């Protein structure tokens, strides 16, 4: 839940700073540092700060009572602040401070932000966002054309969670994390150093900051199909403990037919991509603390049961009716391939395509119980 409260002037309104920064500080404001806190959340705070000395950045800390719960630097580029710098009105940068431990929702308003060296806390924006959402991160995975868009849309609507569509961000950070992991037994000294000093955490913290910044909340839905995202799921557990993973799967005949209608392209490439996604999921799911698998056809034919399965898994049983209703009434793009078109001999494929399908998809089909 996000609420707004009213505080001091100097706000970002409609993408601009209003009133224009660079004015003489008013009574009660620091003559050295200007800034605003714009978001308070259970896992991060964000805003902007300005040190009136060109070339310097403000160091910012968040406190709850006597405890420092977040620390960092205001060094993020933002268009409105960049324009103010170019015009010589204000030397300001944005900041986002993540917390090591979540803050209780009832304590969020008690978080105060300070610029190092300044006694007064950073003022709050008039349109301050207070995000008391429970830490609910839902990752919807699967092969393309398996119903991930339908479920992603349903979850964001029924649970009122932010969703940016297909993010494809986690694989980027996961690859960086793997590169920074290092190896304590390596001959190369730098590689050993990376492992010894836990440089992997740099990528973990970067991913957390990016997800919070993009969604403006500690809770969100990320619907991204494909093998790279499936492979990144264990990394996401590192970034967001307690995350929920929902894997969508679809009969391979219906999936391949839908791919060909939607994307065209090479038949065998679609077969390989489906098989790769399913094989990668078989590997990855053993590394996750928990997950749930949903058959795309069941979302269409048994929405009430699927709604209960999902809400029991995420711990919000009261949302079952909203999810069921959305699954029944909200239909995203459909290719016309049909959930029931599952006989490869009746799919309109050539004999060579049927043989290629059996060769490529057969092992994964049998592993998941498709005849």
Where are the model-predicted features located?
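Short acidic/His/Gly/Ser-rich catalytic and metal-binding motifs that mark active-site loops
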Residues: 173, 254-258, 335
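PAPS-dependent sulfotransferase catalytic core
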Residues: 113, 127-204
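Basic, ligand-binding patches in group-transfer machinery
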Residues: 3-134
């Amino acid at each position: 839940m996000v609420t707004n409260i009213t505080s001091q002037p100097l706000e970002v309104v409609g993408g601009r700073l209003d009133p224009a920064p660079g004015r003489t500080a008013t009574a009660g404001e620091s003559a050295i540092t200007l800034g605003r806190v714009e978001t308070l959340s259970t896992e991060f705070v964000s805003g902007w700060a300005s040190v009136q000395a060109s070339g310097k950045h403000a160091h910012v800390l968040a406190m709850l009572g006597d405890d420092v719960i977040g620390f960092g630097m205001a060094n993020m580029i933002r268009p409105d602040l960049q324009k103010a710098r170019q015009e010589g009105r204000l030397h300001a940068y944005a900041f986002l401070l993540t917390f090591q431990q979540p803050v209780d929702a009832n304590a969020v308003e008690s978080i105060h932000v300070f610029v190092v060296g300044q006694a007064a806390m950073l003022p709050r924006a008039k349109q301050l966002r207070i995000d008391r959402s429970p830490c609910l991160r839902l990752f919807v995975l699967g092969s393309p054309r398996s119903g991930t868009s339908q479920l992603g849309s349903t979850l964001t609507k029924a649970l009122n969670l932010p969703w940016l569509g297909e993010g494809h961000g986690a694989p980027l950070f996961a690859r960086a994390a793997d590169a920074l992991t290092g190896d304590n037994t390596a001959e190369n000294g730098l590689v050993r150093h990376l492992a010894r000093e836990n440089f992997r955490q740099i990528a973990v913290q970067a991913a957390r900051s990016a997800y919070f910044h993009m969604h403006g909340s500690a809770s969100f839905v990320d619907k991204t199909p494909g093998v790279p995202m499936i492979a990144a799921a264990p990394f996401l557990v590192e970034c967001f403990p307690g995350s929920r993973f929902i894997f969508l799967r679809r009969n391979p005949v219906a999936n391949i037919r839908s791919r060909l209608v939607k994307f065209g392209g090479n038949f065998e490439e679609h077969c390989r991509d489906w098989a790769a996604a399913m094989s990668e999921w078989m590997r990855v799911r053993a590394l996750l603390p928990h997950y749930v698998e949903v058959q795309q056809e069941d979302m269409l034919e048994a929405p009430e049961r699927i709604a209960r399965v999902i809400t029991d898994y995420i711990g919000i049983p009261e949302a079952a009716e909203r999810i069921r209703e959305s699954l029944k009434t909200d239909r995203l793009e459909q290719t016309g391939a049909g959930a029931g078109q599952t006989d490869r001999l009746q799919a309109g494929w050539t004999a060579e395509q049927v043989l290629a399908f059996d060769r490529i998809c057969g092992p994964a089909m049998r592993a998941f119980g498709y005849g």
